[in-house]
Amino acid sequence: MGTLFRRNVQNQKSDSDENNKGGSVHNKRESRNHIHHQQGLGHKRRRGISGSAKRNERGKDFDRKRDGNGRKRWRDSRRLIFILGAFLGVLLPFSFGAYHVHNSDSDLFDNFVNFDSLKVYLDDWKDVLPQGISSFIDDIQAGNYSTSSLDDLSENFAVGKQLLRDYNIEAKHPVVMVPGVISTGIESWGVIGDDECDSSAHFRKRLWGSFYMLRTMVMDKVCWLKHVMLDPETGLDPPNFTLRAAQGFESTDYFIAGYWIWNKVFQNLGVIGYEPNKMTSAAYDWRLAYLDLERRDRYFTKLKEQIELFHQLSGEKVCLIGHSMGSQIIFYFMKWVEAEGPLYGNGGRGWVNEHIDSFINAAGTLLGAPKAVPALISGEMKDTIQLNTLAMYGLEKFFSRIERVKMLQTWGGIPSMLPKGEEVIWGDMKSSSEDALNNNTDTYGNFIRFERNTSDAFNKNLTMKDAINMTLSISPEWLQRRVHEQYSFGYSKNEEELRKNELHHKHWSNPMEVPLPEAPHMKIYCIYGVNNPTERAYVYKEEDDSSALNLTIDYESKQPVFLTEGDGTVPLVAHSMCHKWAQGASPYNPAGINVTIVEMKHQPDRFDIRGGAKSAEHVDILGSAELNDYILKIASGNGDLVEPRQLSNLSQWVSQMPFPM
């Protein structure tokens, strides 16, 4: 104790001497507490002296926050900000809660807190508060959180309850939902494996679409890859490893716990009377090439029989809903089901018109997506596969680009997403339809460009057609063969070619090469998001290290990725075929099927990680109030209540595109 006392006295003396140099004289204190207090004051003054030197460097910005005595001004005090934060933290919950008070108690609540007066006070304090809080106050005063807005409809069951109240709608048409690429859970059904990987440990565990997937890819990467990769030669299951798509609504409602996909749609359909006897989720193994889905799983046969059963039991035609790649699957199915031949549907012409009431194309990729090209060239996945951020981070973090490329190349379903229509849709080196959007000095038709060439192998820029050809040329022979057997990415030059292409399955995923079915009573709804920057073109470089991946996006470039209008994944121009169909009867739409186009503006809620009820992002659109509203109206037989809306110039672009017919 004596030692501590002497040390403190010495510190006091030192502090006193230093303070005397600055012109301040302090009396000695006898109390130990006062000695500590004096020590603290001396420490603060030393900091003040040091701060004075820094103040000369910082200049007016530092002095502006202090008054003439060197103290912080009251408006910049942390204590003031804390008090204001606490004040707002108490009053704002009352403000939001007032909107949800029962009608019988609303007057009492309004008398308790006068929100008009609160807004006046908030106006007085807005200039003092941080920018984030000020923006929050602006949203409140603008009425962005009123009950009449769609934000309130982001809650569970909200859209269904509102439509039930306003229109008294009820379930009518059976509903079949076809999910998009990678959004269906994949689970292991194998029990053998090999010497390095015992498959029985993963029996009936989801190796895609669960936290178990994340744990396995981190803890046992080699085993996880052996399960999810397909056999390169056959495109089917590798020996001793068996994965299958999860079934039922659980297969697509959530990707990972907390990250919903179709759950909002299920909830709202349930409100108006839908249940498993009236709707189903047609989950599929999206890794497989389309005809391999039929060859291995009889997927299209099961889908046909499910639709026929629904039609027989209910007496109503079926409503098909496809999201993303699911829309391609539905378009393919409508050609498959009426085609004749082995592994085909053999339903005969007229089957679609007899069994299908409507086709809802929600953010569909009927003409592909540019992101599929860098996925197959250089394994880009973080921004290519729009799903749970944690899952995509795991794929980017724990797998090299070479590993990702090899995995993606075995998945025969991925090439189906390659863009279709060549220069008609995607432009050439001279121009593209989207160029006027941003007044580009360059053109989006220049899809892949090389700013730094290290060899003669890649010494020119590439259009979309050239880029796809290059992608295949640097791919393994077995991938080239599978793509040529399963898909086609061009366009038909005349009506005769359109009809001829209906005979072979490789054309059925491309609406530029085959017409819509003869189904005059079917209705098509194309609903997609706009106003969200979307990848459209890329700058690539050739790596010097031959042992590494040969081609990668050149992130050292000033602009490695060129963005355009879209929904964050699918660019606007990829919906061109909907507008071509909507022009009326033509070789592409021989029956004159009625096509309704609804463009949804992406207006995400800044306080909702999934964007809220007004989001039109590629995946989050499934939770938007507007899309759910349309789905329920169409499924209940009230599709006439869906009003077309075009916010972009795509219809004008399509009229100027060089379609051959």
Swiss-Prot record:
A motif (Bipartite nuclear localization signal) lies at residues 43-50, 64-71. It holds the Pfam family LCAT. Its EC number is 2.3.1.158. It is found in: Endoplasmic reticulum membrane; Nucleus inner membrane. Residues 102-661 are lumenal. One of its GO terms (cellular component) is endoplasmic reticulum membrane. Residues 34-48 have a biased composition (Basic residues). A motif (GHSXG lipase motif) lies at residues 322-326. This is Phospholipid:diacylglycerol acyltransferase. Residues 54-70 have a biased composition (Basic and acidic residues). Substrate binds at residues 162, 325. One of its GO terms (biological process) is phospholipid homeostasis. The gene is LRO1. The keyword Phosphoprotein does not apply. It comes from the Eukaryota. GO terms for molecular function: O-acyltransferase activity; phospholipid:diacylglycerol acyltransferase activity. Keywords: Acyltransferase, Endoplasmic reticulum, Glycoprotein, Membrane, Nucleus, Signal-anchor, Transferase, Transmembrane, Transmembrane helix. It comes from Saccharomyces cerevisiae (strain ATCC 204508 / S288c) (Baker's yeast).
